[in-house]
Design a protein with these regions (language model features):
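Active-site PLP attachment segment
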Residues: 74, 298-334
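Residue-level detector of anion-binding/catalytic polar loops
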Residues: 217, 275, 426-427
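N-terminal basic, amphipathic alpha-helical segments
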Residues: 1-134, 141-144, 330, 335, ...
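Short glycine-rich anion-binding loops that position phosphate/pyrophosphate groups of nucleotides
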Residues: 119, 246-248, 313
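Conserved core of the PLP fold type I
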Residues: 133, 140-272, 284, 288-302, ...
C-alpha cells in the first residue's frame, strides 16, 4: 500500500491541484515513490485529502504529461522510472530562496536628470500617434500577419523619401533595413564587415561593445577639433570606420566637409574592402546652422557608407525603431545571411510611423522639438553662466544635439565629481566616461550635461546645484 506524505493547504494562493502535483513530483524525485509503484485511485486519494476528484485528476494528468507517471488502461497510474539529478543540482521546487545581499547605501533620489539619453515625453505627439494606431487597428488586420524581415515596404518607402529630402541620403527602399534599435542592426551588420573597425574616443561605448561582441576587433582612435583623426586612421589596420560626423558623441564636434571628403577617399582606396559606418546621431537637432548633408549622400547609393539612425531621440526611446541604409554591394551578403530571419519591429508600429512621416506629422513634430529643446538649451546655458564665474567654466557643444559640455577650469578629480553628483542628486556623466582607451587625461573635469528630460522650470535650479556639487568636489579633491 502506498503511504503519501502529501499535505495540502486550502488557504494557499497556489491551487490545490498544483500543490498536489508539486508534492507528488518531489516524492518521485526523492525516491519515496519508486518506479513501478501503482498510484492510489483518483476517488480514493481525493477522499483521503478531502479534495475533489478533478483536483487529483488534474495533478495526475500533469505528472503524466511530464513523464513522472504513465497511464495504463484498467490499472490507473504507475510511477515511471526517474533518473536522479546530478549531485548539487536541485529542481526548482527544492531550491532554497536566494540569500539577500546586504543592502547597499541608498543613493539620494535623483532630482536633476542630466543624462544624455533622456528625452522629453511631454513633447511626444500622443494624440496623433494614438489616432493613427487606432485607425490601423480597425482597418488593417493584415498587419497581424508576418511582414518583410527588412521592414514593411510602406515604412521603407517613407524613410527613403524623408532621408533624401532632409539628410541628402541617396538610396532605394530596398537598401533600407528596419530593426528594434541601433545596437540590434549593428550586431547584424558586424559579420558582414571585412576587418577591424576604427571607433572614436571619446566615443560611444555601446557601439564598440556591440562590434566586439560580434567578433569585430576595434581600434580606438582619437578625435580632434574636426572629428576622427584621419592621420590615426590611415596609420591603423582598420578596414571599417564607425563615426558620428553630424554630432560627434560626446564632444559635439561636427565633421567639416573637407574631413568628410578625406574619409571617403580613405575608403575609396580599397573598394569593397573598406567601409564607413555613419551613425547620424542627433542630426535632427541642429539649432543655429544648417546641417551638412550626410556622408552617405556625399558617397551615393553605390558608395562605401552604411547609414544608421534611430527614432529614439526624435520620438522616444521606448519606440524601438531604428533603420540602416546598406550599400548596394552588401545587399547580396545581407540577403544570404538573414533571409530566414523575422522582423523585430511590430507592423502596427511600422505602419504608424510610415503614416506619421508621409502625412507630414514628423517634420512638424521635429520643428516643435527643435524650438523646445533650443529654449531649454539656452536656459540651462544661462543658468550655468549665472552660477559659475567666467574663469571657472567654459561651455562647448551647444549647436547640435541634446547635451552640452561644461569644462571646468582648474578641475577637481573626476572621482570627486562623480561622488558629489551622487550626493547632490544629479544624474550626469563625465567626458572621461567615454574615453574608450582608459588612458586619456585631457578630458578631466568636463561634465556632459543632457537636457532632453530636464524640465524647463528646473534649469535655473540645476545650474545652482551643479555649482554646489563642483564646489564640494573641489574641496574633496584638495584633501586628497
Amino acid at each position: 500500500m502506498v503511504h503519501l506524505t502529501t499535505a495540502l493547504d486550502p488557504a494557499s494562493a497556489v491551487p490545490l491541484y498544483e500543490q498536489l502535483y508539486r508534492s507528488l513530483a518531489a516524492e518521485m524525485r526523492a525516491g519515496t515513490l519508486t518506479a513501478g509503484t501503482r498510484m492510489p485511485g483518483k476517488r480514493r486519494l481525493a477522499a483521503e485529502l478531502s479534495v475533489s476528484v478533478n483536483t487529483v485528476d488534474t495533478a495526475y494528468q500533469m505528472l503524466a504529461a511530464e513523464g513522472y507517471l504513465t497511464a495504463r488502461e484498467r490499472s490507473g497510474f504507475t510511477v515511471q522510472e526517474y533518473l536522479a539529478l546530478p549531485q548539487g543540482v536541485q529542481p526548482p521546487a527544492a531550491r532554497s530562496a536566494p540569500v539577500a545581499a546586504p543592502p547597499a547605501d541608498a543613493a539620494p533620489p535623483v532630482q536633476f536628470d542630466l543624462s544624455t539619453r533622456g528625452v522629453d515625453p511631454g513633447l511626444f505627439p500622443f494624440r496623433t500617434w494614438a489616432r493613427l494606431q487606432k485607425e490601423l487597428l480597425y482597418s488593417a488586420p493584415e498587419l497581424l500577419t508576418p511582414g518583410d524581415a527588412r521592414g514593411d515596404a510602406a515604412l521603407r518607402q517613407a524613410l527613403a523619401g524623408y532621408l533624401a529630402e532632409y539628410r541628402g541620403v541617396q538610396c532605394d527602399p530596398e537598401q533600407l533595413v528596419v530593426g528594434a534599435g541601433l545596437e540590434y542592426l549593428l550586431g547584424l551588420l558586424a559579420p558582414l564587415l571585412p576587418g577591424p573597425a576604427a571607433v572614436e574616443t571619446p566615443g560611444y561605448p555601446r557601439a564598440r561593445q556591440v562590434l566586439e561582441n560580434n567578433g569585430v576587433p576595434c581600434r580606438c582612435l582619437p578625435v580632434d577639433a574636426d572629428g576622427l583623426s584621419l592621420t590615426a586612421l590611415s596609420a591603423s589596420d582598420a578596414a571599417v570606420c564607425y563615426v558620428t560626423p553630424s554630432h560627434q558623441f560626446p564632444t559635439g564636434v561636427t565633421m567639416p566637409a573637407g574631413r568628410r571628403a578625406e574619409l571617403l577617399h580613405w575608403a575609396a582606396r580599397a573598394p569593397g574592402r573598406r567601409y564607413i559606418i555613419e551613425d547620424d546621431y542627433d542630426s535632427e537637432f541642429r539649432f543655429d546652422t544648417r546641417p551638412l548633408p550626410s556622408l552617405q549622400g556625399m558617397a551615393g547609393a553605390d558608395g562605401p557608407v552604411v547609414y544608421l539612425s534611430t527614432c529614439s531621440r526624435s520620438l522616444a526611446p521606448g519606440i524601438r525603431i531604428a533603420y540602416m541604409v546598406l550599400p548596394r554591394q552588401l545587399l547580396g551578403a545581407w540577403q544570404a545571411k538573414y533571409r530566414l530571419y523575422s522582423g523585430t519591429v511590430g507592423r502596427f508600429e511600422q505602419q504608424t510611423l510610415a503614416r506619421f512621416i508621409t502625412e507630414g506629422y514628423f517634420t512638424r513634430h521635429l520643428a516643435r522639438e527643435r524650438t523646445a529643446y533650443k529654449a531649454r538649451r539656452d536656459a540651462l546655458a544661462a543658468a550655468l553662466r549665472a552660477s559659475f564665474a567666467p574663469e571657472e567654466l567654459t561651455l562647448a557643444g551647444l549647436h547640435t544635439g541634446l547635451h552640452l559640455l561644461a569644462q571646468l577650469k582648474d578641475p577637481p578629480l573626476d572621482a570627486a565629481l562623480r561622488a558629489a553628483a551622487r550626493q547632490y542628486g544629479v544624474r550626469c556623466s563625465l567626458l572621461s566616461d567615454y574615453d574608450l582607451t582608459g588612458t586619456a587625461h585631457s578630458a578631466a573635469g568636463t561634465l556632459v550635461l543632457g537636457y532632453g528630460s530636464l524640465p524647463d522650470a528646473d534649469c535655473a535650479a540645476a545650474g545652482e546645484r551643479l555649482k554646489k556639487l563642483c564646489t564640494a568636489a573641489r574641496e574633496a579633491s584638495d584633501t586628497v
